[in-house]
Amino acid sequence: MARVKGAVRTRARHKKILKLAKGYFGAKSKLFRMANQAVMKSLNYAYNDRRAKKRDFRKLWIARINAAARINGLTYSRFISGLRKSGIELNRKVLADLAVNDAAAFAQLAETAKAAK
């Protein structure tokens, strides 16, 4: 039985990694070992940051809602609590959008939240 060497698979794997490393600076786009390390690191960063993105946006929305709520005489927690008590179930993304783009509508929500005590 003939000895099988993995040249075809190895070449394909190397090409795949080097293709992913296209655009990297210097040896990281030319040499397989360095390209492989750089690609693995970048994929790891991408994986982690897809999760961090969700946390970051939630923090941004909360900061915007808090700022708008304080303009209307409420804290963030009292505003959210008042909305829940009055049965208004808007998510933080929508509330933050209202706070930025439609201050009048947000002010009405704030009044509703104040009245729900």
From Swiss-Prot:
GO biological process: one example: ribosomal large subunit assembly
Keyword line: Ribonucleoprotein, Ribosomal protein, RNA-binding, rRNA-binding
Molecular function per GO: rRNA binding; structural constituent of ribosome
GO cellular component: ribonucleoprotein complex; ribosome
Residues that span the membrane, as ranges: none
Stated family: Belongs to the bacterial ribosomal protein bL20 family.
PANTHER family: 39S RIBOSOMAL PROTEIN L20
HAMAP family according to UniProt: Ribosomal_bL20
Function, as annotated: Binds directly to 23S ribosomal RNA and is necessary for the in vitro assembly process of the 50S ribosomal subunit. It is not involved in the protein synthesizing functions of that subunit.
Annotated protein name in UniProt: Large ribosomal subunit protein bL20
